[in-house]
């Protein structure tokens, strides 16, 4: 029995090196290896192609075992003997790839690289060298990437400069506001100081001189009577200064409202005047047009009369339609008729 089973590994090794096995596998790999690459990602198409490869190998092995008469048990024992020898592992590798996906993937990637190298060799033989797209492709891409990086850096630099300018302008604006607010806060609020500087409150301008004198004397008496309560006096002095701008603002608002009313009235009057002038102009224009129309009609009438007169003068006198026939002509006509009748009679007799 042992001698009978010794020929099985040799026959299997011979089949795996025969064209019946190598040609179908080579055609399958060459037609489907272009999808496989060196990336670590396992795509769905890889598994589908692996299933198709497994079905092909099983069909070829089944046909071989049926032709030779080998059982599956004998085939598995021969496969275990192949694993011990390193030289036969490369021959038996396509069979093991049916159960090992990574081995199948490595075989397909290797086949794809071999086909690419063969294609480059053929192109080099035909053209005498490789084209620039195949030799300088990496360098061109790197140059494009460098240009893009330079453009991005320039854009970032300009955007940063614009941002700094905007922030600087905002800082200057805030400093100007702070300076204006500080200058406003430093201005004196005391009415006596404002009067000494030549600036007067709107209330003080509206008050008469007698009231001003009375208010000044009253304040002096109060100051003399209540010297210890200086703080209250200061507060009472500060009150008019606070109220004055409010009243002034009210007066300003009233004056602005009055100005607006006056402007509206002026506009209304202007529009009324414009409408009146437009109506007058329309009336004058219509009258002028009527006058011109009357003149044209009169001229047409005069020219029509002149034409009729000239036509009547130039026309010849009509000749009488029927002139009276003289006696001599009547006699001649009768003679002609008589001659014509005689001629007719002679012709008829003949």
UniProtKB/Swiss-Prot annotation:
Task: Show the ranges annotated as biased composition (Polar residues).
Answer: 177-220
Instruction: Please state the protein's primary subcellular location.
Output: nucleus
- Coiled-coil stretches, from where to where? 142-167, 280-350
* Stretches the record annotates as Disordered: 171-233, 301-337
Cross-referenced Gene3D superfamilies, in alphabetical order?
ADP-ribosylation factor-like 2-binding protein, domain
- UniProt cross-references to InterPro entries, sorted A to Z: BART_dom (IPR023379), BART_sf (IPR042541), CFAP36 (IPR038888)
- Where is the protein situated, by its record's location annotation? Nucleus; Cytoplasm; Cell projection, Cilium, Flagellum
UniProt keywords, alphabetically: Cell projection, Cilium, Coiled coil, Cytoplasm, Flagellum, Nucleus
GO annotation, cellular component aspect: axoneme; ciliary base; motile cilium; nucleus
Family to which this protein belongs: Belongs to the CFAP36 family.
This chain's protein is named Cilia- and flagella-associated protein 36
């Amino acid at each position: 029995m042992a001698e009978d089973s010794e020929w099985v590994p040799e026959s299997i090794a011979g089949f795996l090196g025969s064209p019946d096995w190598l040609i179908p596998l080579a055609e399958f790999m060459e037609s489907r290896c272009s999808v496989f690459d060196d990336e670590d990602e396992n795509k769905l198409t890889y598994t589908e192609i692996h299933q198709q490869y497994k079905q092909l190998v099983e069909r070829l092995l089944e046909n071989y075992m049926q032709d030779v008469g080998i059982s599956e048990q004998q085939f598995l024992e021969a496969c275990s003997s192949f694993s011990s020898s390193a030289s036969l592992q490369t021959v038996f590798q396509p069979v093991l790839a049916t159960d090992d996906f990574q081995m199948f993937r490595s075989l397909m990637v290797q086949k794809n690289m071999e086909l690419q190298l063969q294609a480059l060799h053929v192109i080099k033989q035909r053209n005498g060298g490789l084209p620039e797209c195949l030799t300088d492709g990496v360098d061109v891409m790197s140059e494009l990437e460098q240009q893009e990086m330079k453009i991005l850096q320039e854009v970032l630099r300009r955007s940063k400069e614009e941002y700094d300018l905007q922030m600087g302008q905002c800082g200057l604006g805030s400093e100007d506001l702070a300076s204006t607010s500080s200058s406003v806060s430093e201005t004196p609020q005391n009415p006596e100081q404002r009067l000494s500087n030549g600036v007067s409150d709107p209330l003080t301008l509206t008050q008469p001189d007698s009231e001003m004198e009375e208010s000044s004397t009253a304040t002096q008496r109060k100051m003399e009577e209540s010297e210890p309560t200086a703080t209250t006096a200061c507060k009472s002095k500060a009150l008019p200064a606070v109220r004055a701008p409010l009243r002034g603002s009210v007066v300003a608002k009233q004056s602005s409202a009055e100005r607006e009313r006056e402007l509206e009235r002026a506009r209304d009057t202007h529009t009324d005047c414009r409408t009146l002038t437009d109506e007058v102009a329309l009336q004058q224009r219509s009258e002028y047009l009527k006058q011109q129309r009357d003149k044209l009609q009169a001229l047409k009438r005069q020219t029509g009369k002149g034409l009729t007169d000239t036509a009547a003068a130039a026309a010849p006198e009509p000749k009488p339609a029927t002139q009276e026939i003289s006696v001599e002509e009547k006699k001649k006509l009768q003679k002609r008729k008589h001659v014509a009748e005689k001629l007719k009679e002679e012709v008829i007799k003949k």
